Amino acid sequence: MSLSAFYVTGTDTGIGKTFVSCILLHMLRGRGQRAVGMKPVASGCTYSDTGWRNEDALALQAASDPTPAYDLINPYALPAAVAPEIAAIEAGVTVALEPLSAAFTQLRAQADVVVVEGVGGWATPLNATIDQATLVRALEIPVVLVVGLRLGCLNHARLSTTAIMADGLRCIGWIANTIDPHMARIEENLALLRQRLPIPYWGHLPHIPPGINPATLAARLHPQGD
């Protein structure tokens, strides 16, 4: 896999972007690459002796090698567990591209690959003037889509893919992540997604119970070019 960075987005919030990003980091590390994660903007942070910290960003930090400073992984750590734009307003913080680009540049200098995890679904804004598409353009990186397998995934996946491409960005692959273990016709839905999405398929993750080490699932993902 020759990419130096990519952006992980999803069909919705709560569909496993962080877990998939951690699996990708372990996959890359298993191939001898220095791989680090980044969560540019995170809401729902908790305060500790070291400052505001986000659970997802900490998971990315733990899956990274080398281990970057937390402030590079998560430049904007917002307390309220709401949409980032609302959380930033409540915290009196203005999210700007410059600190995000600067942190990303430092991470790229430390690693062979940077896995950047987005917020919510693709259309979730960062503030009144910055969408995730704005950030991805500024970083000049492609997008990987995580599709949460549950009722409605066909619609959500097709809309998300269309939106990414309409924004003029390159979507280089998609990963199916089983959110609802009781979803009817999972294989049939997966087959339809593979037929209808005009982007490469990187693999399918089964429903994973809490506590599973993401490193154990690295072999299930196969980025294009492998």
Curated annotation (Swiss-Prot):
Keywords: ATP-binding, Biotin biosynthesis, Cytoplasm, Ligase, Magnesium, Metal-binding, Nucleotide-binding. It catalyses: (7R,8S)-7,8-diammoniononanoate + CO2 + ATP = (4R,5S)-dethiobiotin + ADP + phosphate + 3 H(+). It is found in: Cytoplasm. Pathway: Cofactor biosynthesis; biotin biosynthesis; biotin from 7,8-diaminononanoate: step 1/2. Its main location: cytoplasm. It comes from the Bacteria. ATP binds at residues 14-19, 56, 117-120, 177-178, 206-208, 213. Homodimer. Belongs to the dethiobiotin synthetase family. Catalyzes a mechanistically unusual reaction, the ATP-dependent insertion of CO2 between the N7 and N8 nitrogen atoms of 7,8-diaminopelargonic acid (DAPA, also called 7,8-diammoniononanoate) to form a ureido ring. This is ATP-dependent dethiobiotin synthetase BioD. It comes from Xylella fastidiosa (strain 9a5c).
